[in-house]
């Protein structure tokens, strides 16, 4: 499944991870099952690849992206993920001319991590209204800084360039390309169906089960409803 050719251009690429306990020798460690999916040129979703790792640095991501390109991945214009520096750097070198979009949901979570609970709802609303507008996001950062929440202000400023890239694409796509929600639902299904295992004996057992679940999801996606209406479909 993860060796098959990628036959269509993938303008929108989504990356997300879920975490599992895996036995590593005599130890039990947490490892990431990273899933890469995309929206094809015909508007349908497709699961492109998955890998188990305990290291998410730039070299890992660059290697994974290279494997996908060797299988035929082309046409990438936007990569949507969390704020992991390794992904950001790998996108800039692996997909020349493509943009990186910070998932707005992940950004909000990161900002609220350092905000008192009584203010979280209000700050989340500020962010919701500001996303997609560079000036308004900077105003939110300045406001948080003035209130003494420097860490949260730094988070907004650090991700700011990557929070507005989705606005360069058709407006009708915005809702679905500004977050990794498409993969969040996949990860929930993975968690639900792997729960019975508890701890995996090795990486291979984890990727086997994850792979079989992703195959089922991929079949549903390809045979289901078109996820986005692409420009070529309207002509």
List the predicted regions and their residue ranges.
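Acidic/histidine-rich catalytic cores and adjacent linkers
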Residues: 129-235
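Conserved phosphate-handling catalytic cores of large alpha/beta enzymes
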Residues: 111-133
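Inter-helix linker motif
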Residues: 96-113
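A generic hydrophobic-helix recognition signal that picks specific residues
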Residues: 9, 75, 99, 174-178, ...
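RNase H-like nuclease fold core
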Residues: 1-80, 85, 89, 94-97, ...
């Amino acid at each position: 499944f993860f060796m098959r050719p990628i036959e269509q251009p993938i303008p929108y690429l989504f990356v997300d991870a879920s975490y599992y306990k895996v036995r590593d020798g005599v130890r039990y460690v947490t490892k990431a099952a990273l899933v890469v999916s995309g929206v094809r040129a015909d508007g349908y979703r497709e699961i492109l690849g998955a890998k188990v790792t305990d290291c998410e640095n730039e070299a890992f991501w660059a290697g994974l992206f290279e494997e996908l390109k060797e299988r035929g991945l082309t046409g990438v214009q936007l990569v949507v993920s969390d704020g992991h520096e390794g992904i950001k750097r790998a996108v800039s070198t692996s997909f020349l001319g493509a943009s990186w979009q910070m998932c707005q949901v992940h950004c909000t979570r990161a900002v609220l991590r350092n905000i008192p609970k009584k203010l979280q709802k209000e700050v989340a609303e500020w962010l919701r209204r500001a996303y997609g507008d560079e000036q308004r996001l900077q105003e939110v950062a300045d406001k948080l800084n003035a209130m003494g929440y420097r860490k949260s202000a730094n988070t907004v400023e650090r991700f700011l360039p990557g929070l507005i890239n989705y606005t360069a694409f058709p407006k009708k796509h915005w809702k679905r390309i500004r977050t990794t929600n498409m993969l969040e639902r996949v990860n929930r299904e993975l968690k639900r169906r792997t729960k019975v295992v508890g701890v995996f004996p090795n990486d291979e057992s984890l990727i086997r089960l994850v792979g079989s679940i992703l195959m089922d999801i991929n079949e549903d996606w390809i045979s289901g409803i078109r996820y986005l209406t692409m420009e070529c479909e309207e002509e």
